[in-house]
Amino acid sequence: MKRKIIVACGGAVATSTMAAEEIKELCQNHNIPVELIQCRVNEIETYMDGVHLICTTAKVDRSFGDIPLVHGMPFISGIGIEALQNKILTILQG
């Protein structure tokens, strides 16, 4: 089953692209079919239907119902990337 993931940042360009590429590679390496949607943080609600995970590189102080939310800055900084990858895999494989 294809997993639908929203990757959001402030402008839907630079940091969300980096995070999306990391997530795409992670999923390919673990044979997880994925559909990635890049958007701005303020557009997340537009794309939430059927989503399995939301990853933001900007600070978000709210929840999105039952959809898990992870902070994607480790994909940008490189600090804590393995822990984030493990968390994403746990969510998507669960």
Swiss-Prot record:
Ranges that cross the membrane: none
Gene Ontology biological process: galactitol metabolic process; galactitol transmembrane transport; phosphoenolpyruvate-dependent sugar phosphotransferase system
Modified residues (Phosphocysteine): 9
Active-site residues, as the UniProt record annotates them: 9
Domain PTS EIIB type-2: 1-94
CDD domains: PTS_IIB_galactitol (cd05566)
Induction data: Constitutively expressed.
GO CC term (a single one): cytosol
InterPro entries named among the record's database cross-references: PTS_EIIB-like_sf (IPR036095), PTS_EIIB_2 (IPR013011), PTS_EIIB_2/3 (IPR003501)
Pfam families given in the database record: PTS_IIB
Subcellular location as annotated: Cytoplasm
Enzyme Commission code(s) on record: 2.7.1.200
Function: The phosphoenolpyruvate-dependent sugar phosphotransferase system (PTS), a major carbohydrate active transport system, catalyzes the phosphorylation of incoming sugar substrates concomitant with their translocation across the cell membrane. The enzyme II complex composed of GatA, GatB and GatC is involved in galactitol transport. It can also use D-glucitol.
Domain notes: The EIIB domain is phosphorylated by phospho-EIIA on a cysteinyl or histidyl residue, depending on the transported sugar. Then, it transfers the phosphoryl group to the sugar substrate concomitantly with the sugar uptake processed by the EIIC domain.
Subunit structure: Forms a complex with one each of subunit of GatA, GatB and 2 subunits of GatC.
Name of the protein described by the UniProt record: PTS system galactitol-specific EIIB component
Organism: Escherichia coli (strain K12)
